[in-house]
Amino acid sequence: MEKIIIQTKRRTEFVDITGEIERILKSKNVKSGICYIFVPHTTCGLTINENADPSVRKDIIEKLEQLVPENDKYSHTEGNADAHIKSSIVGHSLTVFIENNSLQLGTWQGIYLCEFDGPRTRNVWLKILP
């Protein structure tokens, strides 16, 4: 298993981790396989989305905030109940095909760590299977 450590800077942000995953993948020299990506946290998640236009990430963050406002009434009173819900909506794992030692993503796709309770130190775990 490989690990990436990300230090987030804001309470809510999407951090592009595609390049870091690709660098690890290149060191493994996997011609064909699967990359399983997982975050062991309950207040952040992972997603694949457009990496060319930052307004897409901004729109997603704004809509999630409308759906699950930070300061709504929640039973969980630690001050981050919304982050738990948002991370459940987004999800905690991704699976991406590998061909010719490269992630098989669409032209405009990137892999994002979705922070909902930052700033924090986050771990991303990778399992690369040939």
Give the role of each language-model region:
Residues 1-130:
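Active-site histidine-anchored catalytic micro-motif
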